[in-house]
Curated annotation (Swiss-Prot):
Source organism of the structure: Pongo abelii
Function: Plays a role in membrane trafficking and in homotypic early endosome fusion. Participates in arteriogenesis by regulating vascular endothelial growth factor receptor 2/VEGFR2 cell surface expression and endosomal trafficking. By interacting with SDCCAG8, localizes to centrosomes and plays a critical role in ciliogenesis.
InterPro entries to which the protein is assigned, alphabetical: Rabaptin, Rabaptin_coiled-coil, Rabaptin_Rab5-bd_dom
Biological processes, Gene Ontology terms: cell projection organization; endocytosis; protein transport
Subcellular location: Cytoplasm; Early endosome; Cytoplasm, Cytoskeleton, Microtubule organizing center, Centrosome; Cytoplasm, Cytoskeleton, Cilium basal body
Modified residues (N-acetylalanine): 2
Keywords from the named record: Acetylation, Cell projection, Cilium biogenesis/degradation, Coiled coil, Cytoplasm, Cytoskeleton, Endocytosis, Endosome, Phosphoprotein, Protein transport, Transport
Main location: cytoplasm
Biased composition (Low complexity): 29-38, 245-257, 393-403
Name of the molecule in the record: Rab GTPase-binding effector protein 2
Gene name for this UniProt entry: RABEP2
Amino acid sequence: MAAAAPVAADDDERRRRPGAALEDSRPQEGANGEAELGELSRLRAELAGALAEMETMKAVAEVSESTKAEAVAAVQRQCQEEVASLQAILKDSISSYEAQITALKQERQQQQQDCEEKERELGRLKQLLSRAHPLDSLEKQMEKAHEDSEKLREIVLPMEKEIEELKAKLLRAEELIQEIQRRPQHVPSLHGSTELLPLSRDPSPPLEPLEELSGDGGPAAEAFAHNCDDSASISSFSLGGGVGSSSSLPRSRQGLSPEQEETASLVSTGTLVPEGIYLPPPGYQLVPDTQWEQLQMEGRQLQKDLESVSRERDELQEGLRRSNEDCAKQMQVLLAQVQNAEQLLRTLQGTVSQAQERVQLQMAELVTTHKCLHHEVKRLNEENQGLRAEQLPSSAPQGPQQEQGEEESLPSSVPELQQLLCRTRQEARAQLQAQEHGAERLRIEIVTLREALEEETAARASLEGQLRVQREETEVLEASLCSLRTEMERVQQEQSKPQLPDLLSEQRAKVLRLQAELETSEQVQRDFVRLSQALQVRLERIRQAETLEQVHSIMDEAPLTDVRDIKDT
């Protein structure tokens, strides 16, 4: 019995030892479960933080998209305002050109009036020149009269000498007459020397008493008759000399009527010697000295007028030549400026085309980055959904396991407990690795999104810089247009109407080219806005998609590589 008692005690002791071991292992398992639960809660907290960070990244992406849309809208508004301002400037320039055209038309009318006045002045000058031809004829007449007067002097000088000789003979005859009168046999009709003048006019009656004297008186009577003949010839020559000299004719005709003057002139002309009568040539006439002096004064005045008119004509011709030279120089300068402006416009067009190409390339890059972002968002959504799907099954078996753990008893053996611990550790390690992998992926996505955001900001800055450059180019173009406008105003004032349509057509062509460039820039901006709107619509559709099939169908649609795709869709 004593031996049996120790054996039983040993058996009881052996039975008690596994129970004690089980009782000792239960606190360890509880501690391990609590640690695993803490690790799971920590992992859940990290997952919640990662999800919250992903939501914040989505919010940041939405904010960036909204800011991008606002920036695009602001750029569009600014471009529209600039286009409106350019259109207003073009309208103002067109109205100013029309006003300049009307002013040039008025100036042309004024120039036509001035030309008509100048033509009238030239007609008057031609009339004066035509009046100058009679002046030449008067000068010729004066020269002819001078020559005739010289010839008359050549004729009159010997006649004057002969008259002097005849006067001497007349004095001798008067002395002889006085001697005869002193004699008692004198003739009663010869009492005065004043009767010699009627003898000179009618010499035949007085010759009868002279014949009587020649018959009765001898040599004295013959001498007296000879002297009477000489006196008759002298009286006739004296009358002829009175008619020939312009100074003695007015004195002898004072106090006579016009008929008596005409009769006296005819008588004196009849008594002239034929060689002494001056007959003017045909087409010429004799004029008095006063009229001759008046004609000379008029000729000198006309000569002065002719000289002044010729000087004015020379000055006008010189001014016209200078104005033509100035106009030619100004035209050359204007052509050079127009060529420079065209070259500047071509360079500006090249820069604008290059800027448009750069903008198109940047738009293509933005489209590609947008597609990449769409793919990344799609992948993130898929991973998020996968993580959620993994989390739900992992959380779902925990409840039954806890209930089963509560309901069922702990493992009865140490190997089972060790296997359970290894299994739980492996599960916890796998969950930790999955969470770390997800967190790493989220970090990578955050970095990529930040890089994409930085690229978008850089693209926006480059677009703003290009817009600033285009503004500067438009300002330079406006300045060149203003300078061209001023030059055109200055040149249009100096040119005639036939050159105005060409310049106007050139300016209109330039305006049309500028309008076409503005329309192309507006079209590019509208296409950019449409493309961004279409991309935003697709992104919103991807966000609102509930299944992966819808996302795949949206992403499998035609890529937005051209604006025509937007118009077709």
